[in-house]
Amino acid sequence: MSATQNYGTGRRKTATARVFLRPGTGKISINNRELDNFFGRETARMVVRQPLELTETAEKFDIYVTVLGGGVSGQAGAIRHGITRALISYDESLRSPLRKAGFVTRDAREVERKKVGLRKARKRPQYSKR
């Protein structure tokens, strides 16, 4: 491993992303696929690019990501969290603007479990008075 590499782990819902930041030209590779090929939705691609655009480092790094678990939205959020952490390990002064934007904090919301006697987590069977 080269010393010029920065690493960050990101998590969101059940998705986990391992992000490697290397000096480069702005190429983003996720599970050995280009960003545009990996995410079909523009919103997911936008979420991934947010920390880079905020810190104006989009053209400074090549980003290599391995992401596991979750769905499209969860994986995009996990990658964003990982990129944020990797940027902070690269330059601690970036923490303040990233925190203001809300990218540093791990989104702790998880799916609520289904309860016995209920159809879903909170949906109850229809109540009959008589």
UniProtKB/Swiss-Prot annotation:
Q: Which UniProt keywords apply?
A: Ribonucleoprotein, Ribosomal protein
Q: Which Pfam families match?
A: Ribosomal_S9
Does the keyword DNA damage belong to this entry?
Answer: no
Please tell me whether the keyword Nucleotide-binding is annotated for this protein: no
Q: Superkingdom, according to UniProt? A: Bacteria
Gene3D superfamilies to which the protein is assigned, alphabetical: 3.30.230.10
Q: Which GO terms describe its molecular function?
A: RNA binding; structural constituent of ribosome
Q: Which GO terms describe its cellular component?
A: cytosolic small ribosomal subunit
Gene name?
Answer: rpsI
Swiss-Prot/TrEMBL GO biological process terms: translation
Species this chain originates from: Stutzerimonas stutzeri (strain A1501) (Pseudomonas stutzeri)
| Record's protein name | Small ribosomal subunit protein uS9
Family indicated by similarity: Belongs to the universal ribosomal protein uS9 family.
